[in-house]
């Protein structure tokens, strides 16, 4: 039921690669009642709604974090209500736009608490050295993300 889905959001993850990563960001903007954890692999909001991107500019990194923050607040959630684990490769063609978005999110510390220690903040970027935009990288990201997410869920249950 709808109530059960909402009540169990702390055990639900939305994950995607690469256009699935764009979908992941958009689900964070409209479906937080169903998911606490968001794991975009090699994709950013820059690849999303062309109207929004055209409005703000392709190389303007100053709109994605505000767009996310406004959507989170509009849903009635705060910085304590989500965790984002972003992964990409240093040779992935998406690296540039992912990094631009993460850098913009770091400029909004009231909502996005960046920490390279993936169990302290509410969002983390992990980079895979020399990984490209391919199946091998995706498998590597899943392999590394699942234990981190498991730790996050366990930590949450102990509170």
Annotate each PLM feature:
Residues 1-159:
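Non-catalytic cap/lid and distal C-terminal segments of serine-dependent acyl enzymes
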């Amino acid at each position: 039921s709808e109530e059960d889905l909402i009540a169990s959001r702390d055990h639900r993850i939305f994950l995607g690669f690469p256009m699935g990563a764009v979908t992941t960001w958009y689900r964070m903007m409209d479906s937080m009642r169903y998911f606490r954890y968001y794991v975009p692999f090699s994709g950013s909001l820059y690849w999303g709604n062309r109207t929004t991107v055209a409005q703000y500019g392709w190389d303007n990194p100053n709109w994605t974090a505000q767009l996310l923050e406004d959507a989170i607040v509009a849903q009635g959630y705060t910085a304590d209500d989500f965790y984002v684990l972003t992964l990409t490769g240093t040779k992935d063609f998406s690296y540039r736009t992912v990094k631009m978005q993460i850098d913009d999110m770091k400029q909004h510390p009231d909502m996005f608490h960046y920490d390279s220690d993936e169990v302290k903040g509410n969002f983390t970027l992990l980079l895979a050295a020399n990984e490209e935009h391919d199946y091998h990288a995706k498998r590597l990201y899943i392999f590394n993300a699942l234990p981190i997410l498991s730790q996050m869920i366990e930590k949450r249950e102990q509170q």
